[in-house]
Amino acid sequence: MMVNDDFQEYVKQLVTKHRDERIYPFQYEGKKYWLKQPEKLKGIWLLLKPHPKKSFKNELYTLLKLAEQNAPVPKVSYYSDHFFVLENVGLTVSQWLCNKNIDEQQKFLIIYDACLALIDLHAKNLVHGRPAIRDITWDKGKVTFLDFESRSNSRNQNWVVIRDMLFFFDSLCREEDISDTFIQKVALYYQTHCEAKNWQNMIVFLQRFSWVYYLLLPFKPIAKTDLISIYRLFEIFLIKKK
């Protein structure tokens, strides 16, 4: 990794100045970067997240290994044992889709690019772990995945792919500004372009757990975002198709 001395020195100054900030955005020679450091935890968070430095090292290791596999992840511009710098990769898909100044045709273009990127990721036998649209960015046609949680305890590749797909579509269902009709079109596009077995496996999973939908249905009038997204997921993929 070739990094010029001036950039290294500038980053080291930022690390000293912002040592208590986990994530700090900055500009250098007209480009935006993100400085990331281990979380500085206090109180109850020391129990809930007892190994922040280990988590930090795992995140860096994951990014570097995925980059070696040509996965669409942010470029690590500079790193050491206690910080790393990522190049900015644009707005998230969630930000794009909820922007009222962008027409629907452009929004479909963006989400279709995200669909193809996730499908390609699975074709490479890679999984994200939580590919919500807030963890996927789009910039001039380039899709990048953030916050990989690719280490799964499951040895069942079919399951981890299904889980990725469910997280992706559930994140669409969480957004109030995204209509059911929009999601249905996205689902059809995804189904058309992904491996048939992956789509079928996801539908079978939803059918198997459709009882969850009916169990939770009485709570719909008072449901918050988490439950509403589950209702929408089942309704769009199963109920409305009957």
Swiss-Prot record:
Lineage top rank: taxon: Bacteria
InterPro entries: Kinase-like_dom_sf (IPR011009)
Alphabetical list of SUPFAM superfamilies matching this protein: Protein kinase-like (PK-like)
Protein name listed in UniProt: Uncharacterized protein HI_1326
